[in-house]
Amino acid sequence: MRVSKYLLSTQKETPANAEVVSHQLMLRAGMIRRNASGLYSWLPTGLRVLRKIEAIVREEMNKAGSVEILMPMVQPADLWVETGRFEKFGPELLRFQDRHNRDFVLGPTHEEVITDIVRKEVNSYKQLPLNLYQIQTKFRDEVRPRFGVMRSREFLMKDAYSFHIDQETMDETYEAMFQAYNNILTRLGLSFRPVMADTGSIGGSMSHEFHVLANSGEDLIAYSTESDYAANIEKCEAPLPTETRQAATSEMTLVDTPNAKTIAELVEQHGIAIEKTVKTLIVKGATEEAPLVAIVIRGDHELNEVKAEKLDAVLAPFEFADEAAISDAIGAGTGSIGPVGLNMPVFVDHSVSIMSDFGAGANQDGKHYFGINWERDLPEAAAFDLRNIIEGEPSPCGKGVIALLRGIEVGHIFQLGTNYSEAMNANVLDQNGKSKTLLMGCYGVGVSRMVAAAIEQNNDDRGIIWPDAIAPFTVGILPMNMHKSHRVKDIAEQLYQDLNDAGIEVMFDDRKERPGVMFADMELIGIPHVVVIGDRNIDNGMFEYKNRRTGEKQDIPLGDIVEFLKAQHA
């Protein structure tokens, strides 16, 4: 591709509204442009990368025995009503009506549509197992789209769905898809980790996420230092306390704490150990009888919202109560809330259930109780695992301790069971002629998200460093002063032709531009292999080769360059 015929829309300055490196570099490299909040157009450079990832995903899906189809982005709402998700899904599901006042949704996922297709087309066990996939645009009306295509409202996704009459073939397909996802990420040249995961709003039993490892990742991965165990921190079980509750040694006293609205301030100003404090968090309840619920965790621990949402009394999706509701119910602000005397259901983390002589808000603004003890000062509360595990704690697998990594989720696979097939009466006749509800699997890959994740893992202060497999171009040709030197022009043109003939994708910078600009653009875009052509090199019978990832420079004889580049790309 000649740059003079290409839409090369690079920018020198970092856009002010781009928070993460991938968003900044995708804008600066001219890969995407924002049309509205969470909506982006893909320009030629970005689209080339996107299509390469899509091709690898498609190849691995086909190898795994999945069959490609294409379903509509616009879906009839009736199907979502059948599964109950039309109301449950929340505002992320964009609902609208056509001119005939019929209800539709813009698909964030396609379980309903695929189940509808299969229940109509498959009626015998002889047609199973069946694994179908598509690569299609999705839309989720995110309340706060962020980080460019990392969390956009419209995105490209590969979603596959498998159907089974028995658990054995379900497990076989799940394993095949697990391996396919490993193959995809390996071929993309990314460092990644598969982890056990929560099934979330889609539901089901077994689930794994695939994370590209990056310091900027939003997800925390907990893994054992001495085994293969790895899980999203949302899923990772915190260890049960090994110690027992100590006897009370002090009376409960009311203390003025006007300037202590956080645990850190309470500890600093009043000298109480943080392990002797608790945080009481008020969340929305699941019933009219208990519209608010209190969750209590130790002061140095973090609430795990996914675990908390699994409590029957807690509203799903999980949501904290607002200040007004808390004030109306308790008569105090959030900085002074505690479990003593609360007139609502109270659930505590296991670590809180063994505490004695601890401090908490007194449900009066500017006041705390110190020396609180269970049974004496407040009734025992139901205890659950409600916190995030901490680095260095024992691994749930029983081997080693937990270490933490940051990752970007790019893939998620589920065993759905009969959640959707039962709701939509997707049944087939088994070997005995009896009707049987289908088992389902669901397998998603964020194709557009992978572009951003790859950049988060592969960049430096000059720009993107693409793995060869997904680089927009494999080789860049930089001819110095080509418009003044016929020798440089002729040799550059011949090399361009030779590389094209060899099937190597080339970006040929034939602009009348300063060398510094040309070099900067090549590095920003992240072309893996760059060939510099100048009169001085030609005099020596050499090309100058530069590797984008290592920065290594080499002089390569003019007659050897094509074979050399083919070897680099192999």
From Swiss-Prot:
SUPFAM superfamilies linked to this entry: Class II aaRS ABD-related (SSF52954), Class II aaRS and biotin synthetases (SSF55681), YbaK/ProRS associated domain (SSF55826)
GO terms, biological process: prolyl-tRNA aminoacylation
Keyword NAD (UniProt): no
GO molecular function: aminoacyl-tRNA deacylase activity; ATP binding; proline-tRNA ligase activity
Quaternary assembly: Homodimer.
Protein name in the entry: Proline--tRNA ligase
Domain remarks in the Swiss-Prot or TrEMBL record: Consists of three domains: the N-terminal catalytic domain, the editing domain and the C-terminal anticodon-binding domain.
PROSITE patterns: AA_TRNA_LIGASE_II
Principal place of residence: cytoplasm
Catalysed reactions, semicolon-separated: tRNA(Pro) + L-proline + ATP = L-prolyl-tRNA(Pro) + AMP + diphosphate
Keyword list, A-Z: Aminoacyl-tRNA synthetase, ATP-binding, Cytoplasm, Ligase, Nucleotide-binding, Protein biosynthesis
Family: Belongs to the class-II aminoacyl-tRNA synthetase family. ProS type 1 subfamily.
A Pfam family reported for this protein in Swiss-Prot or TrEMBL: HGTP_anticodon
HAMAP family: Pro_tRNA_synth_type1
InterPro entries, alphabetized: aa-tRNA-synt_IIb, aa-tRNA-synth_II, aa-tRNA-synth_II/BPL/LPL, Anticodon-bd, Anticodon-bd_dom_sf, Pro-tRNA-ligase_IIa, Pro-tRNA-synth_IIa_bac-type, Pro-tRNA-Synthase_IIa_type1
Subcellular location: Cytoplasm
Purpose of the protein: Catalyzes the attachment of proline to tRNA(Pro) in a two-step reaction: proline is first activated by ATP to form Pro-AMP and then transferred to the acceptor end of tRNA(Pro). As ProRS can inadvertently accommodate and process non-cognate amino acids such as alanine and cysteine, to avoid such errors it has two additional distinct editing activities against alanine. One activity is designated as 'pretransfer' editing and involves the tRNA(Pro)-independent hydrolysis of activated Ala-AMP.
Cited CDD domains: ProRS-INS, ProRS_anticodon_short, ProRS_core_prok
One cellular component (GO) term of this entry: cytosol
EC code: 6.1.1.15
Disulfide topology: none
Gene symbol of the encoding locus: proS
Taxonomy, superkingdom: Bacteria
Organism: Shewanella halifaxensis (strain HAW-EB4)
